[in-house]
Swiss-Prot record:
Natural source organism: Homo sapiens
Region feature Required for interaction with CSNK2B, mapped onto this chain: 202-226
Keywords, sorted A to Z: Coiled coil, Isopeptide bond, Methylation, Nucleus, Phosphoprotein, Ubl conjugation
Record's protein name: Protein ARK2N
GO terms for cellular component: chromatin; nucleus
């Protein structure tokens, strides 16, 4: 609404009076090329409405400031005081520098506003064209910084209307002092918040770098531990055949921790069975020897001479064999059953086949394995019974499913 009224007044004044043109020509010599171009457009075709509508808001405010600066020296104080009252009762967001879109602009403009009212008073009393020159200079600076928004325009209109009369500016002096204090406090708060945020960012970045350093060192320590565990695994089974160790490390699960867990499980089962081996009967011993022979015949990793050689190698060889049973997928179905138990249960699983082999297929083993040499079954007390082996296999399968 204010802008439309101002444009109407400007058109009337430009058609009737010539001094605004002269004052603008004087200021145009001091300004840069953009202001000169605007003054030339005013001289050539001011009456053309399309040219006026095509010019930016900057030209309209230039005309309005020049016309109002001349009107202020001739007219009374009533319309200006009314306008000042309007602008003073406006929103506080218009007064605070943070309302503008550009923070750097707001700081510079607020510092410039503090110095301008005294200069404006002397300029209004002496020469009205000086005020228009100062306002034109500030506007050209604004247009160069490309911060011509509606908030800026309203703020500038309020300032130009405030500076047209000395008494109005003096009345506003007390309020502007409070406003300066408020602006200074707001600026201090903003700077403190920005400094705090910067310090927080610095702290977080350093803590992140420390964390990354710690994680890298811990990961290197973990790598060392893993490599050490793999070394201990390979050092634990030097007596076994090298094919078994290579098969465990590469062909099946290549994770050294999993192999280590398998090793521990197998060792625990073997220790349990060696503790309780005194109370076993001869039937269980026979079943254990049959399972050992079956595993030797099917897997083909161990030879009977190696098993019968000494006790320590026999303590290590079952360890490798049980790791094979636990970690390889192809031998889960082969645990002590193969063709004899499948004759009884063609579609049965591991537990059914082993139980049937325990109860009903002893005669089959006697009839089919008569030619087999039984010298390979000398260290059978260190072996686990088929039930423990099957339980270990099933637990290992479920554990691997959870891992995957």
């Amino acid at each position: 609404m204010k802008m439309e009224e101002a444009v109407g007044k400007v058109e009337e004044l430009i058609e009737s009076e010539a001094p605004p043109k002269a004052s603008e020509q004087e200021t145009a010599k001091e300004e840069d090329g953009s202001v000169e171009l605007e003054s030339q457009v005013q001289k050539d075709g001011v009456a053309d409405s399309t040219v006026i509508s095509s010019m930016p808001c900057l030209l309209m405010e230039l005309r309005r400031d020049s016309s109002e600066s001349q009107l202020a020296s001739t007219e009374s104080d009533k319309p200006t005081t009314g306008r000042v009252y309007e602008s003073d009762s406006s929103n506080h967001c218009m007064l605070s520098p943070s309302s503008s879109g550009h923070l750097a602009d707001s700081d510079t403009l607020s510092s410039a506003e503090e110095n301008e009212p005294s200069q404006a008073e002397t300029a209004v009393e002496g020469d009205p064209s000086g005020v228009s020159g100062a306002t034109v200079g500030r506007k050209s600076r604004r247009s160069r910084s490309e911060s011509e928004t509606s908030t800026m325009a309203a703020k500038k209109n309020r300032q130009s209307s405030d500076k047209q009369n000395g008494r109005v500016a003096k009345v506003k002096g007390h309020r502007s002092q409070k406003h300066k204090e408020r602006i200074r406090l707001l600026r201090q708060k903003r700077e403190a918040a920005a400094r705090k945020k910067y310090n927080l960012l610095q702290d977080s970045s350093t803590s992140d770098s420390d964390l990354t350093c710690d994680s890298s060192t811990s990961s290197s320590d973990d790598d060392e531990e893993v490599s050490g565990s793999s070394k201990t695994i390979t050092a634990e089974i030097p007596d076994g055949p090298p094919v078994v160790a290579h098969y465990d490390m590469s062909d099946t699960n290549s994770d050294p921790e999993v192999v280590n867990v398998d090793n521990l499980l197998a060792a625990a089962v073997v220790q349990e069975h060696s503790n309780s081996v005194g109370g076993q009967d001869t039937g269980a011993t026979w079943r254990t020897s049959g399972l050992l022979e079956e595993l030797n015949a099917e897997a083909g990793h161990l030879d009977p001479g190696f098993l019968a050689s000494d006790k320590t190698s026999a303590g290590n060889a079952p360890l490798n064999e049980e790791i094979n049973i636990a970690s390889s997928d192809s031998e889960v179905e082969i645990v002590g059953v193969q063709e004899h138990a499948r004759c009884v249960h063609p579609r049965g699983g591991v537990i059914q086949s082993v139980s049937s082999w325990k109860h009903g297929s002893g005669t089959q083993y006697v009839s089919t394995r008569q030619t087999q040499s039984w010298t390979a079954v000398t260290p059978q007390q260190t072996w686990a019974s088929p039930a423990e082996v099957v339980d270990l296999t099933l637990d290992e399968d479920s554990r691997r499913k959870y891992l995957l």
